[in-house]
Design a protein with these regions (language model features):
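Beta-propeller blade termini and top-face loops
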Residues: 1-176
Length: 176
């Protein structure tokens, strides 16, 4: 059974960093990078020592500002993502060849994401694109049932897999 978000539940999930400090191929150091999260389903490191995290109904940016390996700053980047079926909430975080941040949402989720540029709505599945410098969010592709895999080829073309549609690999282009 997938975890469901219970009203009033206290966030208790963590992001843990495992390290192999002695080079034997086994993790021997464990550091809690972030805690008090609620069903984090994706993590995307940035180039400044921080990370974007899918934290249930929101995308947050976590930063380690003092270099101790632990997030000590948390900023909500986008909020308003649906949580009706938690195994379909935000996932598959990745950087695109255009420098934008891409992520997926699956079916049975109803989102009204609040952005500085207005509300973006997605009722069901799709692929999102976020410009992290302007916080402009847009839906670039819709129609897959459960888009879990997403990638770009060397020419910047976008492809996604559908975990439930049986269609294999799909060309996911803007407006599709």
């Amino acid at each position: 059974i997938y975890p469901q978000i219970m009203p009033g539940a206290r966030p208790s999930d963590e992001i843990i960093v495992l390290e192999d400090t002695d080079g034997d191929g086994r993790a021997d150091k464990r550091t809690v990078f972030a805690n008090d999260l609620l069903i984090p389903t994706a993590v995307l490191p940035d180039d400044r020592g921080g990370a974007y995290v899918a934290n249930s109904s929101e995308v947050v940016h976590l930063s380690d500002t003092d270099g101790d390996g632990k997030a000590d700053a948390r900023r909500v980047v986008l909020a308003g993502f649906g949580t009706e079926d938690t195994h379909h909430i935000l996932h598959t975080f990745m950087w695109g060849p255009d420098g934008a941040f891409y992520f997926n949402q699956s079916i049975y989720i109803h989102t009204h994401a609040e952005t500085p540029h207005g509300v973006e709505r997605l009722m069901g599945s799709g692929i999102w694109r976020l410009q992290t410098d302007t916080h402009k969010a847009e839906i670039v592709s819709r129609g897959l049932v459960n888009p879990w895999g997403h990638g770009f080829n060397r020419w910047g073309q976008s492809f996604a897999t559908d975990g439930a549609g049986g269609n294999g690999i799909n060309y996911a282009f803007r407006g599709s």
